[in-house]
A protein has these predicted regions:
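Membrane-embedded beta-strands of outer-membrane beta-barrel proteins
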Residues: 40, 66, 108-110, 126, ...
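Amphipathic alpha-helical recognition patches that constitute DNA-binding helices
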Residues: 37, 63
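Primarily recognizes Gram-negative and organellar outer-membrane beta-barrels
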Residues: 1-36, 71-105, 115, 119, ...
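Short helix/loop segment immediately N-terminal to the Walker
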Residues: 50-60
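Transmembrane beta-barrel domains of outer membrane proteins
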Residues: 43-45, 111-113, 193
């Protein structure tokens, strides 16, 4: 069992124009969000091969692991009317009230690490984050009354492009998002590590009855 702490940058985004759902396509909203995250995770090795390839030289090792932990992050969703000019959404209060730019998440996932020649490591890591905010995309509850918003906020909050007979579903008080479920996001990362300690004999380890160093 090991403890791993990291600082990560992730950029997420979506566009209703790419949706196959009619109502969501008509909603016509889009966002992008830069997320800066600090996390600590416990890692548990599930499976280990100490001599990958069976060469007998013990130069390449492989670890399969799972992890879980907690993180906090700063995020800043931006919206656009044309997909080119982006505006910070949080200060605009597009649903009529504010939310925090700092939030927490529980990262859960796993991956594979391959260590070559004891000091160089490559990894592939899948990370699922269940957050405690519903505003990564600035969309959570219902459409606000445009009379209670600034002109810019009203324009970005409701960009309906559907048929006229369905416009009633996008009026103030109607569903804009789903506040019952908090936001989640996934990342798939390639990692590289270089060890600068461990050349001292005191760090030697033994596998399969022989000294691997």
């Amino acid at each position: 069992l090991a403890l791993n702490s990291s600082i990560d940058y992730t950029r997420i985004g979506a566009d209703d124009a790419n949706s196959l759902s009619g109502p969501r396509y008509w909603r016509n909203l889009r966002f992008t969000n830069n997320i800066f995250e600090i996390s600590s995770k416990f890692e548990l090795i599930l499976f280990q091969i100490s001599d990958l390839g069976g060469t007998g030289r013990y130069r390449t090792n492989m670890d399969v692991f799972a992890h879980a932990g907690i993180s906090f992050f700063y995020h800043n969703p931006k919206g656009s009317k044309n997909g080119y000019s982006w505006v910070n959404l949080r200060p605009l209060k597009t649903e009529g009230f504010s939310y925090k730019s700092i939030a927490f998440a529980t990262p859960i996932g796993g991956g594979i690490n391959i260590t070559y020649n004891r000091y160089t490591r490559f990894g592939l890591v899948l990370n699922y984050r269940q957050t405690f905010t519903d505003y990564l995309d600035d969309i959570s509850t219902v459409f606000a009354d445009p009379n209670n918003l600034s002109t810019e906020a009203a324009e970005l909050s409701n960009q309906y492009i559907g048929p006229e007979e369905s416009s009633v579903n996008f009026m103030p008080g109607e569903k804009r998002g789903n506040s019952k479920n908090k936001d989640v996001f996934f990342t798939l990362s390639l990692t590289y590590s270089k060890y600068f300690m461990g050349r001292n004999p005191r760090y030697r380890t033994y596998r399969y009855g022989r000294n691997s160093y």
